[in-house]
């Protein structure tokens, strides 16, 4: 089976590595593992050459199904990271407003606005 079987094995490892949920404490290690597996699989995919036997075609179909699941899981992780970044930014702004309350006016109520200038 050769290269197709190797791609299948790496894809299976990748599927297991992307299993949800991803606790924020483990996120860095899991992202590093996923990145390593993706690079390994990319190298193997470059070595793929037809013709494929019936068994290799069956493995290929399974790889395609797994790949769709992996993509969906990675998109969810990406959304979690984006949400965490937004929350961190909001917390930082709220903390800055609390520490320095008069640096930026919160509202412009009662301020005179000259339309001509």
UniProtKB/Swiss-Prot annotation:
GO biological process, one term: bacterial-type flagellum organization
Gene (name only): fliT
Compartment(s) where it occurs, according to its Swiss-Prot or TrEMBL record: Cytoplasm, Cytosol
Keyword Chaperone among record annotations: yes
Task of the protein: May act as an export chaperone for the filament capping protein FliD.
UniProt GO cellular component terms: cytosol
Protein name: Flagellar protein FliT
Domain of life from the UniProt record: Bacteria
Lineage of the organism: Bacteria, Bacillati, Bacillota, Bacilli, Bacillales
Family classification: Belongs to the bacillales FliT family.
Keywords, sorted A to Z: Bacterial flagellum biogenesis, Chaperone, Cytoplasm
Complex formation: Homodimer.
